[in-house]
Amino acid sequence: MPRSQINGNFIDKTSSIVANILLRIIPTTSGEKKAFTYYRDGAIMSAQSEGNYAEALQNYYEATRSEIDPYDRSYILYNIGLIHTSNGEHTKALEYYFQAIERNPFLPQAFNNMAVICHYQGERAILRGDSEIAEAWFDQAAEYWKQAIGLTPGNYIEAHNWLKITRRLEFE
């Protein structure tokens, strides 16, 4: 087994142990514990990282039924969006990213992922010969990237450069 895989397994196991200890000692309601358990099983227990998207989605959906904190819920919804993105289900992914941002408007990675999807749709429209639709998708991508960059200046360098090159950058 390669060293990186051994280290990864060690980190996963350590994270699981720490999460279990915290779950026992931090005062939480039974609903919060249940939500965290589903979240942990969906994310920390490697279902998502191993490509078991159906299992991870099931755990995330269960977590959304139990989690009431908007901030925590935003990350669960964001992770559901990630899985739908990985599966090529871009419309569903956008829906979950929107829901995540509604609960936590300071989630630059959700804005970035929405921009990437819009940019991809713009590229597809170009291949179909529909430049007007492509421009609309690119304009939307630009808006999302501006929001992501505004939240985390210095990140998303490639997006920043694309905004400059395409003359869609209005701030600076």
Swiss-Prot record:
It is found in: Plastid, Chloroplast thylakoid membrane. It holds the Pfam family TPR_1. Keywords: Chloroplast, Membrane, Photosynthesis, Plastid, Repeat, Thylakoid, TPR repeat. It is a peripheral membrane protein. SMART domains: TPR. TPR repeats lie at residues 35-70, 74-107, 122-155. It comes from the Eukaryota. InterPro entries: PSI_Ycf3_assembly, TPR-like_helical_dom_sf, TPR_rpt, Ycf3/AcsC/BcsC/TPR_MFPF. The keyword Thylakoid applies. One of its GO terms (biological process) is photosynthesis. The keyword Cell division does not apply. GO terms for cellular component: chloroplast thylakoid membrane. Essential for the assembly of the photosystem I (PSI) complex. May act as a chaperone-like factor to guide the assembly of the PSI subunits. Belongs to the Ycf3 family. This is Photosystem I assembly protein Ycf3. The gene is ycf3.
